[in-house]
Curated annotation (Swiss-Prot):
SUPFAM superfamilies: FKBP-like, GreA transcript cleavage protein, N-terminal domain. PANTHER family: TRANSCRIPTION ELONGATION FACTOR GREA. Residues 47-68 form a coiled coil. It comes from the Bacteria. One of its GO terms (biological process) is DNA-templated transcription elongation. Necessary for efficient RNA polymerase transcription elongation past template-encoded arresting sites. The arresting sites in DNA have the property of trapping a certain fraction of elongating RNA polymerases that pass through, resulting in locked ternary complexes. Cleavage of the nascent transcript by cleavage factors such as GreA or GreB allows the resumption of elongation from the new 3'terminus. GreA releases sequences of 2 to 3 nucleotides. It comes from Flavobacterium psychrophilum (strain ATCC 49511 / DSM 21280 / CIP 103535 / JIP02/86). HAMAP family: GreA_GreB. The keyword Coiled coil applies. PROSITE patterns: GREAB_2. One of its GO terms (molecular function) is RNA polymerase binding. Belongs to the GreA/GreB family. Keywords: Coiled coil, DNA-binding, Transcription, Transcription regulation. This is Transcription elongation factor GreA.
Length: 158
């Protein structure tokens, strides 16, 4: 059973570009590697040929999985999102109630999460805890070492 995944325009383009890269460049390279290994002689004792065939099989599996993800991908219509609540694509500024530290996160789909750039998945513990919250609300988030309380200070969209 396939699962629908939601993407921003940027995330969907990145997925499509990666899929095209695999099909247009990696697939022909894998075929060329097999042909080169085949030309080296007896296939029954040719470890290079076996490795090339295995690599091709793994590549085809990856392509198939990515095609399935892409076919079930849906573009998020930002105009339909409620701007008063923390939802996917929201920029949320929060304050840790225990230490007063302020942080800003961009809530994104799981496939687009990148903590280095401040993008957290809506399926992460913090992302789940912030979903649906409004400015001024306290989000109680269960993490492995206890419960964190964050106050939502600001919600914006690009």
């Amino acid at each position: 059973m396939s699962t629908v995944s939601y993407y921003t325009a940027e995330g969907l383009k990145k997925l499509k570009d990666e899929l095209e890269q695999l099909k247009a460049i990696e697939r022909p390279k894998a075929s060329a590697d097999i042909a080169e290994a085949r030309d080296k002689g007896d296939l029954s004792e040719n470890a290079e040929y076996d490795a090339a065939k295995e690599a091709q099989g793994l590549l085809e599996l990856k392509i198939k999985k990515m095609e399935e993800v892409y076919s079930n991908a849906r573009l998020i219509d930002e105009s339909q999102l409620d701007v008063s609540k923390a939802l996917v694509l929201s920029h949320v500024k929060i304050k840790n109630q225990s230490n007063g530290m302020e942080m800003s996160y961009h809530l994104v789909a799981e496939s687009e999460a990148d903590l280095k750039t401040g993008k957290i998945s809506v399926t992460s513990p913090i992302g789940k805890g912030l979903l649906g919250k409004s400015v001024g609300e306290i989000a109680e988030i269960t993490v492995p070492n206890g419960i964190l309380k964050f106050e939502v200070l600001e919600i914006t969209r690009d």
